[in-house]
């Protein structure tokens, strides 16, 4: 029995999330159908994490076991012929027995994309949160620095979270602006349900001047976010990387 690790990129716009569900189109459903055809046997996959409806992935890790003998290089090419254009197997490699996309992961990095412009860009509607108000990125980064380290992130967990512990460690969190695009990168050893999108929403309020850095700090310390209305829109979020070794120290 072989254990295969895939890195998969996808545009989540047309899917009801990553996780397999009955009678609906999800990324995992489509991927398993293709892999089952390629391997000549029923394939059950495991992802490094769930992404919600409309969320994208630059590098989602997927593992599965198979008795099939198709070489990994051939698998990548063959998958391209069976999968829709919005799901791509970027790479495939054989891993030691016991390796698991989710349980072997040490950290993840997410990106969140904002576009700030007077006019909405119709070609980016599905790929960024578009705002017309200019943001104070310096203040947003001051607040983001408070996330670094190990904290109780209950303030940024949506109801429905199945994670048993709200204690997470954040290794990096920073906004970077280039023209009208403002990109948030955040890396940590784990994330609660809607945690990244809730953090983004709160930091954007700081950038708009509706909340202060001190307000953000108080909410984090108090482990509740009284002003949080809803998560930032799903379409701006990207699962960017999943790490299986210690987070690199810069």
Language-model features and meaning:
Residues 1-250:
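Structured-RNA-binding interfaces characteristic of tRNA pseudouridine synthases
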């Amino acid at each position: 029995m072989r254990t295969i690790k895939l890195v998969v990129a996808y545009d989540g716009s047309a899917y009801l999330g990553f996780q397999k569900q009955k009678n609906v189109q999800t990324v995992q459903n489509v991927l398993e159908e293709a892999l089952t055809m390629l391997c000549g046997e029923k394939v059950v996959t495991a992802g490094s994490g769930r992404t919600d409806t409309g969320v994208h992935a630059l590098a989602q890790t997927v593992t599965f076991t198979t008795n099939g003998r198709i070489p990994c290089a051939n698998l990548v090419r063959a998958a391209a012929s069976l999968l829709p254009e919005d799901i791509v197997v970027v790479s495939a490699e054989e891993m030691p027995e016991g390796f698991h996309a989710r349980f072997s992961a040490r950290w993840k990095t997410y990106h969140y994309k904002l576009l700030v412009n007077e006019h909405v860009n119709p070609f980016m509607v599905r790929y960024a949160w578009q705002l017309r108000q200019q943001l104070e990125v310096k203040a947003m980064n001051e607040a983001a620095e408070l996330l670094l380290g190990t904290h109780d992130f209950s303030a940024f967990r949506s109801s429905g979270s199945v994670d048993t512990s709200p204690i997470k460690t954040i290794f990096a969190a920073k906004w970077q602006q280039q023209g009208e695009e403002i990109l948030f990168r955040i890396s940590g050893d784990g994330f609660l349900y809607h945690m990244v999108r809730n953090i983004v929403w709160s930091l954007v309020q700081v950038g708009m001047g509706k909340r202060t850095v001190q307000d953000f700090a108080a909410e984090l310390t108090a482990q509740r976010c009284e002003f949080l209305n809803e998560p930032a829109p799903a379409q701006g979020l990207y699962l960017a990387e999943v790490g299986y070794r210690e987070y690199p120290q810069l």
